[in-house]
Swiss-Prot record:
Domain called KRAB: residue spans: 103-174, 232-299
GO CC entries: nucleus
Mapped zinc finger ranges (C2H2-type): 420-442, 448-470, 476-499, 505-527, 533-555, 561-583, 589-611, 617-639, 645-667, 673-695, 701-723, 729-751, 757-779, 785-807, 813-835
Highest taxon of the lineage: Eukaryota
PROSITE patterns in alphabetical order: KRAB, ZINC_FINGER_C2H2_1, ZINC_FINGER_C2H2_2
Protein name: Zinc finger protein 28 homolog
Length: 868
């Protein structure tokens, strides 16, 4: 096969380190016209043109003429002869070219290898992108592009163009004649392992042309297609191995098969991507390729395939079952676009083994019987022909190997079955390597460790992506907004979410759509209830790994996100973003009902329940409902008695974190909230708001019984207990009940004798803060309460109220026995002692014969006292 076609290979002048240019102008193609910007490639490499660009007739000189910009090469010391072989990136499309023949995208496209692309500087890369995209748009506007080429899709997505793998788009013709040139490879030390020698593996890889992909370098597509009746398929080039190879050997094979398939795809003579190539693209093992014969593949050509009977023979080096398939000779025109991509040819040759297979046709589409399938599953071996039918395979005998012969690895289990099962969770995998990586989840093994931060990973790909965090490398850039990403998947998600709005992944339970499968998988855990991420400290489980990471910072105390304004730190980036709105004043979430704006969306959602009256969170103990789940959680602590927030100074505990923060200000004396009217400061915003109503006169809380209004809700609630008689706070010592909790606290100090509030001037102590405040006015001389009738001032509002009765003549305190009426309770109390016989003297009064007559007068008119 190779010998027959070798005569058509021309011997071009090769570039150093690579093969020669592999294309020349096709007959009938019109000349191309240069665009205003043409790229000069670096001297180290060259682009690989498809159809006529920089062909033999154009390689004499670099592009010249007006509008051509030759970018500087990195290696200016290279010989001038090499610089002459630089090729232009794109060519413009003129109407006159249409008369000489249709122009395709392949006529104006240039490919780069990875090595060549890395030698381009950023200016050259940007120019390449612009020219290629402009050429495609010009062709599309003329209707010359039926579908978007992969290289354009990659450029639009910000990918590097050398990553493009061409999909097979045309007929796969099985009767092609392979033409390649054998190129010797340098021997590498310790290249082989086991029983494979250096000489054997190097000779085999060389004969199959796997290092430099010589088919792509030395093949003249146009000349071949015009002169040869048959075409080359990937099955003529692909090599399968049934013995475990060294990683270096695997790279040799993978790169070669990959590039050969890419070359055939660029020629446009393939119908679908082979399974072998798909597996290599997915970083899977090529021996996992499975073949399953299906029904009729082509209309008009029914009996085009013949399967081969298997002849068993034990082999000590590998396991599995071999099958082989042959094709009848067909022209390209006999194939259609509905080629079954699952039926892909491959060749399974054991390196160093001398094996050949005999051909014995059976009925088309005949599948393996269940009995034979069980036999294959049970034995799990490779079956070969008799020794008498084996042939020695050297470089010449490989050429004699029938081009239609294919040896396929079958395991007795059809495609779609998963072969490797995890013993821990029973999850199955199609590759042993995938199972190995998965098992590290159970063992906790993380063999890949970052030298920068010490973080470890269970697989190499995650480790490679992580390292970009330290290097800052973001190779994937969005062509719309210019945003760059560390991972290609992040770019795709960004592209769908912000630019295209595409959501191709639908939830089968609720129909919700997502832009990537990761979001869908996370969403489905809501339906399944799965929480696979568990905290090692408190054993709390989470649906998402990110939620676990944030939760673990509660235990570690880590707060990596710091505000640039106030230096406050947060454990979550979202919390920092919300906090920064406090400084900026931004409130992006607005209520459509009342126009009130909020900093967080969750606050808006809670606010909307005020309008709807919805209270979906109900306490199971008392049946009380709440509009916010956090309110329910706080309320439930009343029933459980839990007080998780404790003050480190006085050890006082609270049910809410906000209450602890308010309490801590009593120790620090901090009062950050100041009234702009009078300058009075407060430790809480709620106290400031209540105080400001004193100036505005606003009293939004109204009693439904008597209509009395109050400036704060707590005062209104306490007032309503006058009507209901409710006294919910009872002293456990004496059983006395009170309307307010603060009254109970003050009362309990009468039993304990505690007086925590001490005057800093005279040292006098009080059991209540208000008593201390009133006492301090004695030292300061402040009398804030003034009578509007006589302008007399008083220290306490109670004294003012008593004084007002002098003007009104009101006597509110009546003694039932004597029916005597008094203006003040003190007068009434003293009068009662007359009837009880209890002695009472005032230490500040002078000694008189009738202190009873003097004392009431002294209380309301101290000036009437005689001088001592």
């Amino acid at each position: 096969m190779r010998g027959a076609a070798s005569a058509s290979v021309r011997e071009p002048t090769p570039l150093p380190g690579r093969g020669a240019p592999r294309t020349k102008p096709r007959a009938g193609r019109g000349p191309t016209v240069g665009t205003p910007a043409t790229l000069a490639l670096p001297a180290r490499g060259r682009p690989r043109s498809r159809n006529g660009l920089a062909s033999k007739g154009q390689r004499g000189a670099a592009p010249t003429g007006p509008g051509h910009r030759a970018l500087p090469s990195r290696d200016t010391a290279l010989p001038q002869e090499r610089n002459k072989k630089l090729e232009a990136v794109g060519t413009g499309i003129e109407p006159k070219a249409m008369s000489q023949g249709l122009v395709t995208f392949g006529d104006v496209a240039v490919d780069f290898s990875q090595e060549e692309w890395e030698w381009l500087n950023p200016i050259q890369r940007n120019l390449y992108r612009k020219v290629m995209l402009e050429n495609y748009r010009n062709l599309a506007s003329l209707g010359l592009c039926v579908s978007k080429p992969d290289v354009i899709s990659s450029l639009e997505q910000g990918k590097e163009p050398w990553t493009v793998k061409r999909k097979m788009t045309r007929a796969w013709c099985p009767d092609l004649k392979a033409v390649w040139k054998i190129k010797e490879l340098p021997l590498k030390k310790d290249f082989c392992e086991g029983k494979l020698s250096q000489a054997v593996i190097t000779e085999r890889l060389t004969s199959y042309n796997l290092e430099y992909s010589l088919l792509g370098e030395h093949w003249d597509y146009d000349a071949l297609f015009e002169t040869q009746p048959g075409l080359v398929t990937i099955k003529n080039l692909a090599v399968d191995f049934r013995q475990q190879l060294h990683p270096a050997q695997k790279n040799f094979c993978k790169n070669g098969i990959w590039e050969n398939n890419s070359d055939l795809g660029s020629a446009g003579h393939c119908v679908a991507k082979p399974d072998l190539v798909s597996l290599l693209e997915q970083e899977k093992e090529p021996w996992m390729v499975k073949r399953e014969l299906t029904g009729s593949l082509f209309s008009g050509q029914r009996s085009v395939h013949e399967t081969q009977e298997l002849f068993p023979k034990q082999d000590s080096y590998a396991e599995g079952v071999t099958d082989r398939t042959s094709n009848t000779k067909l022209d390209c025109s006999s194939f259609r676009e509905n080629w079954d991509s699952d039926y892909v040819f491959g060749r399974k040759l054991a390196v160093g083994q001398e094996t050949q297979f005999r051909q014995e046709p059976i009925t088309h589409n005949k599948t393996l019987s269940k009995e034979r399938e069980r036999t294959y599953n049970k034995s799990g071996r490779w079956f070969y022909l008799d020794d008498s039918e084996e042939k020695v395979h050297n470089r010449d005998s490989i050429k004699n190997f029938q081009k239609s012969s294919v040896v396929i690895k079958q395991t007795g289990i059809y495609a779609g079955k998963k072969l490797f099962k995890c013993n821990e969770c029973k999850k199955t995998f199609t590759q042993s390597s995938s199972l190995t990586v998965h098992q590290r989840i159970h063992t906790g093994e993380k063999p890949y460790k970052c030298n920068e931060c010490g973080k470890a990973f269970s697989d190499g790909s995650s480790f490679a992506r992580h390292q970009r965090c330290h290097t800052g490398k973001k190779p994937y850039e969005c062509i719309e907004c210019g945003k760059a990403f560390i991972q290609n998947t992040s770019l795709i998600r960004h592209w769908r979410y912000y630019h295209t709005g595409e959501k191709p992944f639908d939830c089968i339970d609720c129909g919700k759509a997502f832009s990537d499968h990761i979001g869908l998988n996370q969403h489905r855990r809501i339906h399944t209830g799965e929480k696979p991420y568990k905290c090692d400290v408190c054993h709390k489980s989470f649906r998402y790994g990110s939620s676990l990471t944030v939760h673990q910072r509660i235990h570690t105390g880590e707060k990596p996100y710091e505000c640039d304004v106030c230096r406050k730190a947060f454990s979550h980036h979202a919390s920092l973003t919300q906090h920064q709105r406090v400084h900026s004043g931004e409130k992006p979430f607005k209520c459509k009902e009342c126009g009130k704006a909020f900093r967080q969306n969750i606050h808006l959602a809670s606010h909307l329940r005020i309008h709807t009256g919805e209270k979906p969170f109900e306490c199971a103990e008392c049946g009380k409902s709440f509009s916010i789940s956090s309110q329910l959680a706080t309320h439930q602590r009343i029933h459980t008695g839990e007080k998780p927030y404790e003050c480190k100074v006085c050890s006082k505990a609270f049910t809410q974190k906000a209450h602890l923060a308010q309490h801590q200000k009593t120790h620090t004396g901090e009062k950050p909230y100041e009234c702009k009217e009078c300058g009075k400061a407060f430790s809480q915003t709620t106290h400031l708001i209540q105080h400001q109503r004193v100036h505005t006169g606003e009293k939004p809380y109204k009693c439904m019984e008597c209509g009395k209004a109050f400036g704060d809700n707590s005062s209104c609630t306490q007032h309503q207990r006058l009507h209901t008689g409710q006294r919910p706070y009872e002293c456990i010592e004496c059983g006395k009940a009170f309307k307010t909790k603060s009254s109970l606290i003050c009362h309990r100090r009468s039993h304990t004798g505690e007086k925590p509030y001490e005057c800093s001037v005279c040292g006098k102590a009080f059991s209540h803060r208000q008593s201390l405040s009133v006492h301090q006015r004695i030292h300061s001389g402040k009398k804030p309460y003034e009578c509007k009738e006589c302008r007399k001032t008083f220290i306490q509002i109670g004294h003012l109220n008593q004084h007002k009765r002098v003007h009104t003549g009101e006597r509110s305190y009546n003694y039932k026995k004597s029916r005597k009426v008094f203006r003040q309770t003190a007068h009434l109390a003293h009068h009662q002692r007359i009837h009880t016989g209890e002695s009472s003297t005032c230490p500040s009064l002078p000694s008189t014969s009738n202190p009873v007559d003097l004392f009431p007068k002294f209380l309301w008119n101290p000036s009437s006292l005689p001088s001592p």
